[in-house]
A protein has these predicted regions:
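FAD/FMN-dependent oxidoreductases across multiple families
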Residues: 124, 198, 222-299
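FAD-binding beta-loop-beta segment adjacent to the flavin cofactor pocket
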Residues: 198-201, 256-274, 326-335, 342-349
């Protein structure tokens, strides 16, 4: 066993290695609860969280913790493919947009007033679990703690395994401002599959904030990322399709989110719990992260007050298997995504779909959603996935 002297190291009750969405949500809720004032908490991240580096969206019925960070809401959304368009009435849900900097400011404006919480702008280089404590090294310092919450994603480890399919939700987005009023600020474009599919699952995603301003993202659910030029060429073509001739690009963003049912929680140990994408908090079948992380962070804060073993935190549900079925299909036949999502949204109740994606539906409601999907595809996926029942 490696022995590391902690004579000159500062010790914390909790260290968060990586301070992304999941870590910040969790620490914010720990502070809000008032139950952790006697616990010292350290957040470590190489990023200062002072730029508008990403956009999150989520749906909800009632107002929640992140209301101050929401910059735009929609009661209506558009779903489209090459053959049809459908206006989706989302009520009682609202579709919400959160810009990264607004979220960071909300969290840090609160937690940095807490005497027991520290944020250090350092890159984590090593994590070690010892007999009586855990150890974290950065490029310049070392720390010890009772428990580590790690959100640094092990990309190589996940992608090198072959048991579970791994796709990516990857995209480039442009925030643009046009000279002409061309957007409907009351309606988001949830998925527009009318773009050429090219053997993949490809769609445009449009979030208008005014009649002249919108975020347009070219998004894929597939295995391989594209060259930057291909994403941007597709965005340009879509802008032309909308009839926009004069516009300026205000900001750009890009991302790649793993979509997999890999059992991240099997790596949980006595003192280290993976959270966020590294812990399987991303919704595997869609890549949505904000709502799932909101739920999981609340569950974790409640869990920590029960003095239980970290390995008891995660519980696998029926939705894990549902996600696995879709990923199994897209892994084998990536070109079928538009067909599957179109079958769900063409005539289905969008509020029931949202409830299903939130993992809040009954078995009867599950059947209402799943029965709209191409039956033969899912029967074959079930047959291919029978081996997973051994670990379900």
């Amino acid at each position: 066993m490696i022995r590391i002297s902690n004579t000159n190291m500062k010790h914390y009750h909790y260290i968060f290695t990586g301070s992304g969405l999941a870590a910040l949500m969790t620490v914010y809720k720990m502070a809000k609860s008032g139950k952790f004032k006697e616990k010292t908490i350290l957040l470590l991240d190489e990023n200062q969280k002072k730029t508008n580096d990403r956009t999150w969206c989520f749906w909800q019925i009632e107002k929640g913790d992140w209301e101050p960070s929401i910059s735009k809401k929609w009661d209506s959304a558009l779903f489209a493919n090459a053959d049809f368009q459908r206006n989706l009435d989302l009520q009682p849900y609202q579709y919400n947009m959160v810009q990264g900097l607004d979220f960071y400011n909300q969290v840090f404006d609160f937690i940095l007033h807490e005497k027991n919480i520290s944020y250090v702008n350092q890159k984590v280089t090593d994590i070690n679990e010892l007999e009586n404590h855990a150890y974290v090294a950065t490029e310049t310092d070392s720390y010890t703690c009772d428990t580590i919450f790690n959100s640094i994603y092990d990309k190589e480890g996940v992608e090198n395994q072959t048991k579970y399919p791994v796709l990516q939700q990857h995209f480039i987005g442009w925030f643009i401002k046009s000279k002409e009023p061309v957007f409907n600020p009351d309606q988001a474009t949830f998925m527009d599959f009318s773009v050429e599919q090219k053997g993949n699952t490809r769609f445009m995603y449009v979030l208008p904030t005014s009649t002249t301003e919108a975020l347009l993202e070219y998004t894929l659910f597939s295995h391989q990322l594209l060259n930057k030029e291909e994403y941007e060429q597709e965005i340009k073509q879509y802008i032309e399709k909308l009839g926009i001739q004069n516009f300026e690009i205000i900001e750009k963003e890009k991302g790649s989110i793993p979509m997999t049912c890999y059992l991240f929680w099997n790596k949980t140990t006595k003192r280290v719990l993976n959270i966020g994408t590294a812990g399987g908090w991303t919704k595997a079948s869609t890549g949505y992260t904000f709502k799932n992380s909101d739920k999981k962070s609340s569950q974790l804060v409640a869990f920590l007050q029960q003095d239980r073993e970290l390995k008891e935190f995660h519980t696998k549900t029926k939705f894990w298997f549902y996600d696995l079925l879709l990923l199994n299909i897209l892994d084998k036949h990536n070109e079928l995504g538009a067909r599957i999502f179109s079958s769900i949204f063409k005539k289905g109740d969008p509020t029931l779909v949202f409830k299903f994606l939130d993992e809040e539906t009954s078995y009867f409601e599950d059947l209402q959603v799943i029965s709209r999907c191409p039956q033969l595809l899912f029967i074959k996926a079930i047959a291919r996935s029978m081996r997973y029942f051994l670990v379900f």
